[in-house]
């Protein structure tokens, strides 16, 4: 199975798990509790702008849960807001107040519902370290996954604001 965590876009061959029941959602659940899936049941897992919504104290166990359901050799495609890029945008003295406000919302979440808050500020160092601790190998940063049309490719103000990584079980 190919599992899209937090997704909404239907795509042939992929199943969607989302925290809310919506059209195209196959499973309702939380990224931090994937116990409804068997060990080694997924060949690929995709999570775009979901992991930052996990409280800091649950990040490692969440990544271990993702690792558990991936088949050996399986790929985890993960995208999060890149705090290094967002900080650069935010402190830019040439940025107007609207740019700064939009950037701040990308840092902390839009906060339009109880699930739209960011608990963790990711960068390449943190991502590589947590993936390694969870048992992943070969964490490689990529510009784009080319799988779904989503925030992983978002480039406001000409900057790609996502940290996109593919890790292997």
Can you say where each PLM-predicted feature lies in the sequence?
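Conserved SAM-binding loop
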Residues: 2-88, 125, 165-169
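S-adenosyl-L-methionine-dependent methyltransferase catalytic module, highlighting the catalytic core
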Residues: 58-65, 71, 75-168
């Amino acid at each position: 199975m190919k599992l899209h965590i937090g997704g909404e876009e239907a795509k042939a061959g992929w199943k969607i798990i989302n925290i809310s029941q919506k059209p195209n959602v196959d499973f309702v659940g939380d990224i931090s509790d994937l116990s409804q899936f068997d060990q080694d049941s997924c060949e690929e897992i995709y999570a775009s702008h979901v992991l930052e919504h996990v409280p800091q104290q649950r990040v490692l166990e969440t990544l271990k849960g993702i690792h558990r359901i991936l088949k050996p050799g399986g790929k985890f495609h993960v995208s999060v807001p890149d705090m290094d890029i967002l900080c650069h945008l935010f402190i830019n003295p040439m940025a107007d107040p609207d740019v700064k406000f939009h950037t701040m919302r990308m840092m902390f979440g839009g906060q339009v519902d109880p699930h739209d808050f960011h608990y963790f500020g990711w960068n390449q160092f943190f991502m590589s370290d947590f993936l390694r601790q969870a048992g992943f190998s070969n964490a490689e940063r990529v510009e784009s996954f080319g799988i779904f049309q989503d925030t992983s490719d978002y480039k406001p103000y000409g900057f790609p604001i996502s940290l996109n990584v593919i890790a292997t079980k």
